[in-house]
């Protein structure tokens, strides 16, 4: 692990001022800086502007070199607001890329893109730092073992199981439940999985970041009494940050996760909410740098930027990084270049459907659109594979019959098709589940359902043993035993009403 001079906070004062330049131009978050001949910084070097503005307020802005323009000028993107900067101010070249604290000192803390703590819990030990720009592991270091990562969420474990050490995408438009699903996964996995997690909040709502932090403190994932016992490090670059910070905050979180994998040899969970905002920030920066836009106005380097981030998220012989990424889908269009580029890197996709959310079925995971490379008999076993395929067949047949039902009604269907529709509606409701993190909204306690129990439940519905139970008995329950108990309660209530 390379240890670099820190590029923010008090460490800057110790930097040699041998390479310093002057601000020549400021356009929003983009600075042009002139350096003396022969003293030009490298691409991705961190530059620091320190001084006072006209009102006497202290300024400390870190930028990253993006372009060498010629005539001894470079173009850099600021990682924080450029308010108060003026032409002619001194700019110091740190001689290295942005570096952030890594290791056990990061657990239980909240950082910004520069690796500075923003939780007001005092300074962080910065003796071990790592540059945010690194190359992906070599082929020979990669690990290719295939094993299932149980989440306790029925629809995920049965129909689109996650791979341990794989990359998973949660696709959905605005307000269909991506962040709630990520928070539930953090809750379930942090309790069941002993390793550490890193959460990268990239360009999302500050309120959600705060809610997540409070929830983690309540559940004990962050230990307030003994911060070192915490299981998670949080890195936030939220919606109000300049595009430079939103573009790089994902790399800051990834760098912290890589240290746990490579040096501590741990299995790490990396949550990114939202990978689309990383692309969006890259698009803003690209436009500010004057590059010609590509399809739908995205940056021409979209695939390269996505690849350089995603290829570092992988499993090596030392340890693994299992990554769960929320992907906002603009206007619910999965063919948009941002989600379409992300698809190529994933082992499993969990697609959230607005139609299911409108029906009140949560998690609103589309069972027919969601995919996984792990759903193969040699990996999950014959029983799991066959149950999943039969569930999908039943739901697909129901989907095909919906036009006929809406025009002619259920009575026009054959006896067999009516039975299929009844079972499909039960399956659809049984795929819903109460979440621990949504207890305040639903009023029902969260449920973690093991894989074996999930398979047993769906096999019972498919076999026809539960054909006599009402549909609503299967809605928002955990195991199949809860559904039968709920059916008995519903029957008692209807008897009492009579």
From Swiss-Prot:
UniProt cross-references to NCBIfam families, sorted A to Z: atpD
Single biological process term from Gene Ontology: proton motive force-driven mitochondrial ATP synthesis
InterPro entries: AAA+_ATPase, ATP-synt_VA_C, ATP_synth_F1_bsu, ATPase_a/bsu_AS, ATPase_alpha/beta_chains, ATPase_F1/V1/A1_a/bsu_N, ATPase_F1/V1/A1_a/bsu_N_sf, ATPase_F1/V1/A1_a/bsu_nucl-bd
Organism listed in the record: Oenothera biennis
Name this protein carries in UniProt: ATP synthase subunit beta, chloroplastic
Binding site for ATP: 172-179
Example of a GO MF term: proton-transporting ATP synthase activity, rotational mechanism
Subunit record text: F-type ATPases have 2 components, CF(1) - the catalytic core - and CF(0) - the membrane proton channel. CF(1) has five subunits: alpha(3), beta(3), gamma(1), delta(1), epsilon(1). CF(0) has four main subunits: a(1), b(1), b'(1) and c(9-12).
GN (gene name): atpB
A Pfam family matched in the record: ATP-synt_VA_C
């Amino acid at each position: 692990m390379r240890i670099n001079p820190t590029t923010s906070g008090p460490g800057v004062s110790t930097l040699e001022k041998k390479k310093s330049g002057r601000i020549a131009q400021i356009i929003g978050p983009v600075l042009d800086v002139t350096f003396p001949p022969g003293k030009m910084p490298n691409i991705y070097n961190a530059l620091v502007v320190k001084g006072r503005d006209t009102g006497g307020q202290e300024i400390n802005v870190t930028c990253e070199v993006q372009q060498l323009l010629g005539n001894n000028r470079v173009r850099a993107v600021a990682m924080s607001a450029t308010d108060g900067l003026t032409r002619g101010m001194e700019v110091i070249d740190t001689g290295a890329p942005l570096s952030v604290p890594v290791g056990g000192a990061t657990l239980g803390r909240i950082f910004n893109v520069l690796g500075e703590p923003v939780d007001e819990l005092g300074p962080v030990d910065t003796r071990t730092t790592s540059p945010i720009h690194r190359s992906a592991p070599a082929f020979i270091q990669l690990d290719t073992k295939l094993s299932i990562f149980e989440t306790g969420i029925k629809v995920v474990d049965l129909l689109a199981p996650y791979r341990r050490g794989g990359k998973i995408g949660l696709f959905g438009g605005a307000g269909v439940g991506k962040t709630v699903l990520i928070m539930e996964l953090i809750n379930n996995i942090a309790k069941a999985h002993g390793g550490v997690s890193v959460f990268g909040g990239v360009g999302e709502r500050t309120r959600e970041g705060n809610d997540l932090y409070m929830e983690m403190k309540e559940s004990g994932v962050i230990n307030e009494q003994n911060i070192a016992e915490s299981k998670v490090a949080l890195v936030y670059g939220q919606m109000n940050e300049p595009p430079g910070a939103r573009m790089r905050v994902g790399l800051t979180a990834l760098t912290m996760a890589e240290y746990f994998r490579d040096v501590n040899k741990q299995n790490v969970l990396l949550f990114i909410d939202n990978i689309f905002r990383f692309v969006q920030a890259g698009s803003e920066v690209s436009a500010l740098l004057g590059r010609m836009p590509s399809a739908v106005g995205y940056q021409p380097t979209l695939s390269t930027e996505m690849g350089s981030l995603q290829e570092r998220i992988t499993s090596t012989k030392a340890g693994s990084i299992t990554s769960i990424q929320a992907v906002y889908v603009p206007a619910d269009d999965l063919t948009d270049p941002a989600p379409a580029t992300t698809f190529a890197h994933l082992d499993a996709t969990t697609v959230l459907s607005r139609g299911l959310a409108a029906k009140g079925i949560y998690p609103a995971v589309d069972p027919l659109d969601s995919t996984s490379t792990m759903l193969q008999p040699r990996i999950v076993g014959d029983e799991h594979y066959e149950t999943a395929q039969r569930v999908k067949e039943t739901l697909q047949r129901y989907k095909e019959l919906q036009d006929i039902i809406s025009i002619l009604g259920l009575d026009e269907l054959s006896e067999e098709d009516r039975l299929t529709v009844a079972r499909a509606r039960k399956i659809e409701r049984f795929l819903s589940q109460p979440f621990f993190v949504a207890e305040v909204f639903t009023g029902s306690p969260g449920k973690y359902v093991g894989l074996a129990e999930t398979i047993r439940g769906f096999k019972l519905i498919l076999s026809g043993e539960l054909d006599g139970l009402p549909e609503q008995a299967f809605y928002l329950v955990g195991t199949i035993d809860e559904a039968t108990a709920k059916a008995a309660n519903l029957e008692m209530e209807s008897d009492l009403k009579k």
